[in-house]
UniProtKB/Swiss-Prot annotation:
Biased composition (Pro residues): 250-259
Keyword set, alphabetical order: LIM domain, Metal-binding, Zinc
Annotated source species: Dictyostelium discoideum (Social amoeba)
Pfam families attached to this UniProt entry: Arrestin_C, LIM, MIT
InterPro entries recorded: Arrestin-like_C (IPR014752), Arrestin_C-like (IPR011022), Ig_E-set (IPR014756), MIT_dom (IPR007330), MIT_dom_sf (IPR036181), Znf_LIM (IPR001781)
Protein's name according to its UniProt entry: Arrestin domain-containing protein E
Biased composition (Low complexity): 74-146, 260-269
Region (Disordered): 74-150, 245-286
Amino acid sequence: MSSEILQTGLQLVKSAIDADNQKNYSLACNLYDQAVLNLKLALVAEREPSKNALISSKIEEYSQRNKFIKNLLSQQPQSSQPSQPQQSQFSFPSVPSSISPSINQQQQQQQQQINNNNNSILSSFPSAGNTNNNNNNTSNGFSPPNLNKNEQLSKLNSLSIGNNQSTNRQLSRVEAYEAAKNFSLKGRKEEEVKNYRGASQCYEEACNYYLMAIKSEPDPTLKKNLSDEAKIYLDRIEVLKPFAASQPQPQQPQQPQPQQPQQQQFQQQSYNNNNSTQSMLSSFPSFNGSTNSLNNSLNNSNNNFNQILTNSNMPIAQQNFLQNHQFNQSNNSFNNATSSLPLTFSGDKCAACDALLSTNSIKALDRNWHAECFQVSIICAGCQKPFALSNLSLKVKDNRAYHPMCFESTTGLSQEEIRTFVGSSKQLFFSIQLQRKFYRAGETIQFGFTIDNGTTKKVEKVVAYLLMTETRMEITGTAYERKPKRTIKKLGRCEFHHSNRFPLIKDRFEGDFFYSIPPNILPSEVTGVDASFVREYQLIVKCVGPPLKIMTVKLKFNLTILDK
């Protein structure tokens, strides 16, 4: 089952990457969601640590790519009009309406100095649309300038991207975009409390990471969306400059500095982990590359997944599933599709403690568990003992768990026998119904029995007793052969007869039989890996006739005698 789930997840990943390369981002987004869900289910069932680490890393990679596409898709309809719609998309707090003339003059001098240095930078920063280079700042107020491609790139490169220790390692486009979103959100919070200097610094950091994401993004459409989003914070920096200059310098600017070594250490640790698993990444498709390169990487993989990835076509059942849920029509279609998933899926949380699951979790009773939580929460409904986690095997009946042997002992509680006799067309019917098969020494067994005697044979009484069988494996002979030695004993004989109804001839009788198990008997036992010693019990119930005319109907039940 785990291999089938993993195969479905990998085929969904291939389809998602194909849609991603074809710029069908709506379909790719939903396929990534479905693929991540299947890979998580496969991770729960996978027991090999190396495969668990690989699947976990790929789940994180696909989730980041999916989140990256979702954020950009939400802004794609506004890309044709970069000015007004983008300003309405971000809710910035208002700033004071007037500034001092001295600050305005200082800001104009700084802006003129920056514009003189723009010609020394040679890179490409995509623009959101056509900009009007002839517009100038008004004399009565301050408005953000409209920058062309070179000016936008110049503005981004003029920020402190080279001085930040956390950007020494080149981040991927997804990591850079996530960092940019975090800094932009932090800047908006600083602006809400009117800390314009801190907000400007956060916006500058966000623009740094936007530039890294733009340079690493190969798709022109996504580049354009990133450029539009970065331009919003560039313009906002220009608006906040005079207000940031009017604020006093903070007395302790070293407060955010301890975060930088921690961030650098975390990034270095993530970089080392990526290098350690680089040899296993060939079995999974990546985002950069064409379909041919994906197929080559799949065919050349050295792990056990190469047979799963050879078929690049999506299964017919999966195509019908996608067609029924209309993944191509809306971004919220996957949310509607999840209603058809089993309600027992707990979202990678333990059913007992509701905590996140680790890789060594187990799945039982249609739920996911920590191994320890399952052992203390669920016991066998038959023998009232916990389950062994080394080789977990259980049976479920009426939403209760049983050991396989205990489950077999709960079946066959009803037996019946029909006896015919020579020279008579009538029959003797004898049936017994037990309540259970687990008892302790000294306990009383109550069972109902029915005798329907249509013959002329007499049924004088009903007899019940326990038949104990002990089997020992012994080595005999010169060849050291193992042969069983069996010992059989009859214990606790008990009789039932009704003075007014027995002997029973051409009549029917229904009643209850109460049988007391001897208090000194030993429990059922199986010793040794090869069952070198076995102690078993059978409940024998029979109806008998006159001694001189042998007429016996016997029923046997396998019982389990528990330890006191």
